[in-house]
From Swiss-Prot:
GO BP: arginine biosynthetic process via ornithine; L-arginine biosynthetic process
One Pfam family cited in the UniProt record for this chain: AA_kinase
Keyword terms: Amino-acid biosynthesis, Arginine biosynthesis, ATP-binding, Cytoplasm, Kinase, Nucleotide-binding, Transferase
Record has ATP-binding as a keyword: yes
E.C. number(s) listed in UniProt: 2.7.2.8
One of the record's GO cellular component terms: cytoplasm
Pathway this chain belongs to: Amino-acid biosynthesis; L-arginine biosynthesis; N(2)-acetyl-L-ornithine from L-glutamate: step 2/4
Binding site for substrate: 70-71, 92, 186
Subcellular location: Cytoplasm
Protein name: Acetylglutamate kinase
Broadest EC class assigned to this enzyme: transferase
UniProt superkingdom: Bacteria
InterPro entries cross-referenced by the UniProt entry: AceGlu_kinase-like_sf (IPR036393), AcgluKinase_fam (IPR004662), ArgB (IPR037528), Asp/Glu/Uridylate_kinase (IPR001048), NAGK-C (IPR041727)
Length: 299
């Protein structure tokens, strides 16, 4: 008993590893697309922990792909330049001046910071934008009216991604995309991650957010819905109980699962090691969406 008390912390750590074993076995060799954004991009400690999670996922046999946003950083730069940020249904209104800032921040700064941190932590990452290798082809999105250089993805060149994965690299993708009209388009990072996951028929699509997941009551943090099948997710989408940036998140999760992604997750990126907790533990921490009803496991 004394011995157990003395090594209590070590035993607890061992139990965590034991709990993770079936998930490591289950997901080894599978592809997981992670949309990285929100507060986890601004807090240096959180940023490091997210990248540690991603490197660990790679080391235990998963194939993580990072698609990143940059909303907070873009907002800060626009504010510094005296340009007002405007949104329609969670999508940034993007005129020509804003598009230049978006591309500069996403591809020139954030993408390279993520790549550098992954490499520092022992991983091997390559950073690209949707324009590189014609990775993400887009056209103007008019579903919310004319909101400028906002695009919707019409094609994903998976050869670029699979080439990196086959060589053991972690792809880090900025969602700025090209159009056949020669223009650059700003594509919502959640949507881009969803389209990439669909094209690859990924095991999982995981969206890091600044909320606990999907709440049945937006004003009650304890009302987290931990699991939803497609029918429930669609009903919730049409209920009017979500707004703002959660709209494209839930929408892209629904489309991803409809188009071959096994599970889509919306999780709180503000929590320490949230990715590992969602993937490798029995309970998970956020909302998981699948095609059909779930058994009592997280697989």
């Amino acid at each position: 008993m004394i011995r157990r008390q003395k090594y209590g912390d070590e035993i607890a750590k061992a139990q965590v590893l034991i709990e993770a074993l079936p998930y490591i076995k289950k997901f080894s060799g599978t592809t997981v697309v992670i949309k990285y954004g929100g507060s986890a991009m601004l807090d240096c400690n959180l940023k490091r922990m997210v990248m540690q999670d991603i490197v660990l996922m790679k080391f235990v046999g998963l194939n993580p792909i990072v698609v990143h946003g940059g909303g907070p950083e873009i907002n800060k730069m626009l504010e510094r330049l005296g340009i007002e940020s405007k949104f329609v249904n969670g999508l940034r209104v993007t005129d020509e001046a804003t598009m230049e800032i978006v591309e500069m921040v996403l591809t020139g700064r954030i993408n390279k910071e993520i790549v550098s941190l992954i490499n520092e932590l022992g991983g091997q990452a390559i950073g690209v934008s949707g324009k590189d290798g014609r990775l993400l082809k887009a056209e103007k999105d008019t579903s919310n009216g004319d909101i400028g250089y906002v695009g919707k993805i019409v094609d994903v060149n998976i050869d670029v991604i699979t080439m990196m994965l086959e060589k053991g690299y972690i792809p880090v993708i900025a969602p700025t995309s090209f159009g056949d009209d020669g223009k650059t388009y700003n594509v919502n990072a959640d949507t881009a991650a969803g389209k990439i996951a669909e094209a690859l028929k990924a095991e999982k699509l995981i969206l890091l957010t600044d909320v606990e997941g999907i709440l049945s009551n937006i004003n009650d943090k304890s009302s987290l819905i931990s699991r939803m099948d497609l029918e429930h997710a669609k009903e919730f989408m049409n209920s009017g109980r979500i707004n703002g940036g959660m709209i494209p998140k839930l929408e892209c999760c629904i489309k991803a699962v409809e188009n071959g992604v096994k599970r889509a997750h919306i999780i709180d990126g503000r929590l320490t090691h949230s990715l590992l907790l969602e993937i490798f533990t029995d309970e998970g921490i956020g909302t998981m969406i699948g095609k059909e009803c779930f058994d009592d496991d997280n697989l």
